[in-house]
């Protein structure tokens, strides 16, 4: 959408739409971008097919949660920085409020038997859901598990395998590995002009509920950690899981394994972007200030990247070097997600029952197409309660 064309919708209307989508938009990133196409292109006619595809392409190219980034872009396309800001805030605010309320309940009642029973089932289901999401992301972003396709994309599969191995071995996020994979793939597949020229290339250096309970140093750590995590969300909000697990559980020790899985589950039962789990984690660590800082830090890279790229995106989108760089990073990040599933799975699948629940969750996503993640989580919670109290 160009600046000379006046949008057919008002700033209030687009803000109201994203507030509604953030409140009722269940189903994860793929479902959310589908809702936007149905509502904004097919039903309301606010966007053309070409405008929608341009926004979706930007959301897939740049780091950040897919649905939130598309929403910010659409807001920017109609009403500039103000539109992007209001659309982004409206989209994230409902789920943020929900995870803060759930965080309060979790802190107050998390030690009670019924709450532990709920998350006994939920934790296992989360493993199945994340595992299936990792499988779908692998096929979508790298290639199908077909010998010919895998041979054609062998280097991306190598980066993917490296991501799995490094994550399992180190049990934390290795940002420099992801950057190295992106740079190497760019150099091999589509080297920039300055690399092709016979000139000296400059070196690149990679460098009660506790509502108000926090300390300044913790907030600084939360801000810096979630800022880094938000900058490396490629393909799906679930790609943030390995980053969060490595830092939240291993590096800082803010949460234990079960609390971390519970945090991921909370994100799945609330509408809006999956990365809102950052707000829940922030609340558990440092109360309401922690929730605010973690959420802002996670979404800030997405917001900045979108506003920076949107004005000249058509030119950037044709740059083969940038696309190759993103492809390389994406392959290793998805590999890290698979590695995280393995690590968390070994600690969450504690008996035969939890193994069955995890398998059920994965199979439900395959064979029961209309059964969305929140319903699967709800069924798993009911099973957990039944097992513990019946």
Language-model features, listed with the residues they occupy:
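Multi-pass membrane proteins that catalyze or facilitate reactions on polyprenyl-/lipid-phosphate substrates
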Residues: 1-62, 69, 73-270, 274-390
């Amino acid at each position: 959408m160009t600046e000379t064309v006046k949008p057919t919708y008002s700033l209030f209307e687009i803000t109201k739409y994203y507030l509604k989508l953030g409140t009722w938009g269940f189903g994860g990133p793929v479902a959310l971008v589908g809702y936007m196409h149905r509502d904004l292109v097919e039903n309301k006619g606010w966007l053309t097919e070409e405008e929608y595809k341009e926004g979706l392409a930007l959301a897939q190219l740049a780091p950040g949660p897919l649905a939130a980034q598309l929403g910010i872009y659409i807001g920017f396309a109609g009403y500039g920085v103000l539109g992007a800001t209001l659309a982004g805030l409206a989209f994230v605010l409902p789920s943020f409020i929900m995870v803060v309320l759930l965080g309060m309940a979790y802190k107050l009642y998390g030690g009670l038997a019924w709450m532990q029973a709920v998350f006994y089932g939920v934790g296992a289901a989360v493993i199945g859901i994340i595992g299936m999401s990792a499988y779908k992301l692998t096929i979508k972003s790298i290639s199908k598990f077909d010998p010919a396709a895998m041979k054609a994309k062998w280097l991306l599969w190598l980066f993917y395998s490296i991501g799995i191995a490094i994550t399992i071995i180190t049990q934390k996020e290795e940002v420099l590995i992801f950057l190295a994979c992106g740079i190497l793939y760019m150099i091999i597949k589509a080297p920039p002009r300055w690399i092709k020229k016979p000139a000296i290339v400059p070196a690149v250096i990679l460098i009660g509920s506790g509502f108000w309970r926090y300390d300044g140093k913790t907030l600084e750590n939360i801000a810096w950690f979630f800022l880094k995590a938000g900058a490396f969300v490629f393909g799906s909000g679930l790609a943030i899981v390995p980053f969060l697990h490595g830092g939240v559980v291993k590096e800082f020790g803010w949460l234990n394994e079960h609390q971390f899985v519970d945090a991921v589950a909370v994100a799945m039962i609330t509408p809006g972007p999956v990365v809102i789990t950052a707000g829940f984690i922030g609340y558990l660590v440092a109360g309401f200030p922690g929730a605010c800082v973690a959420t802002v830090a996670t979404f800030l890279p997405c917001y900045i990247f979108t506003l920076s790229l949107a004005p000249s995106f058509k030119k950037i989108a044709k740059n083969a070097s940038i696309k190759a760089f993103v492809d390389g990073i994406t392959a290793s990040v998805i590999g890290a997600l698979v590695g995280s599933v393995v690590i968390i799975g070994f600690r969450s699948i504690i008996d035969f029952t939890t193994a069955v629940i995890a398998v059920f969750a994965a199979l439900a996503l395959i064979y029961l197409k209309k059964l969305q993640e929140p319903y699967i989580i709800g069924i798993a919670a009911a099973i957990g309660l039944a097992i513990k109290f019946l």
